């Protein structure tokens, strides 16, 4: 369900490092999906790498390492369906991605490592995710990866979207605005 994009300096993932990091980050993605190591979960666990030339990556107005902490510049964007993660879950992702990169490219025993590993979690608004040319909801993604809708995690998801439906209704949003789970019916938006 999440997509992870890794931007890294040219030449910093030599040899088997990229493949090793891809595997570690795939493990992070599966952890994010609640351990969904199912065919559906694996199909949604996408890691993309973009190598950036040194002359195209500026920090503090410079392209060298003057303002860069070891193990170097890394920017990771993690796209997740809106409403899937609370603040604690996102903090777990920040820590796990940083650890994977420092473990493979730096010195994990040095507490100063990883300050230049930037991890940004982006919530993709419900209704903006698609596959096979169709819009898919977070509920459909949960079904695909085998995430139970009876557990605490999905209870939080339902509470999040129920509150959002009430907010939309109170603000007078049109019922077909989008951004709500299919189970949050148009009637719920109108009645709020």
Pin down the residues of each PLM region.
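A domain-level signal for the structural core that forms small-molecule/cofactor-binding pockets
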Residues: 1-192
């Amino acid at each position: 369900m999440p997509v992870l994009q890794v931007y890294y300096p040219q030449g910093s993932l030599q040899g088997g490092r990229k493949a090793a990091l891809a595997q570690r980050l795939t493990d992070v993605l599966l952890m994010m999906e609640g351990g969904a190591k199912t065919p559906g979960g694996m199909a949604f666990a996408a890691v993309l790498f973009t190598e950036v030339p040194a002359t195209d990556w500026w920090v503090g107005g410079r392209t060298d390492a003057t303002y860069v902490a070891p193990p170097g510049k890394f920017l990771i964007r993690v796209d997740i369906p809106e409403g899937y993660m609370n603040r604690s879950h996102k903090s777990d992702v920040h820590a796990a991605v940083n650890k994977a990169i420092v473990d493979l490219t730096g010195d994990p025993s040095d507490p100063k490592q990883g300050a230049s590993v930037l991890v940004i979690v982006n919530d993709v608004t419900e209704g903006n995710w698609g596959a096979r040319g169709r819009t898919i909801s977070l509920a459909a993604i949960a079904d695909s990866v085998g995430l139970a809708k009876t557990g605490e995690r999905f209870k939080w998801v339902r509470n999040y979207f129920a509150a959002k439906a009430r907010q939309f209704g109170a603000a007078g949003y049109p019922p077909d605005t989008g951004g709500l789970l299919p189970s949050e019916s148009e009637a719920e938006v109108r009645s709020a």
